């Protein structure tokens, strides 16, 4: 077990979430080259902080501090929304473990999943949060996963079975929905 020995309080006085989520120089050569030569186009778009904030501002203020509320990002990319959601939950008094346990997401590209996990760890470190890194990784591996969201059962948090996918396809053909 790896225990992070930072203080228990988030020092948001010196932490700037807008700077942390800045993607103005995001299309680095490394990132662009990871997508070159791939067999499929991902049509990735990484949401700038201003849009992330504007969308998250639409969430009821009381939801951020409610430990029973869950947040789901069906295509989390590099984690812009996920990181902001976790940060905002922490700012509203939710502990790190609950913030992670109530945040779910699906992403098609495995490298983006790894990047998101790493960004969350960096967020915790930057905020000086005392957390268990192994436990945090276990939660992220369960809740922030790599899969095609079209074949993911969000209600039961698992992939659809082949039979379920056939039933869904059949229903779409007969009802158009």
What spans do the regions from the language model cover?
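SAM-dependent methyltransferase catalytic region
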Residues: 2-177
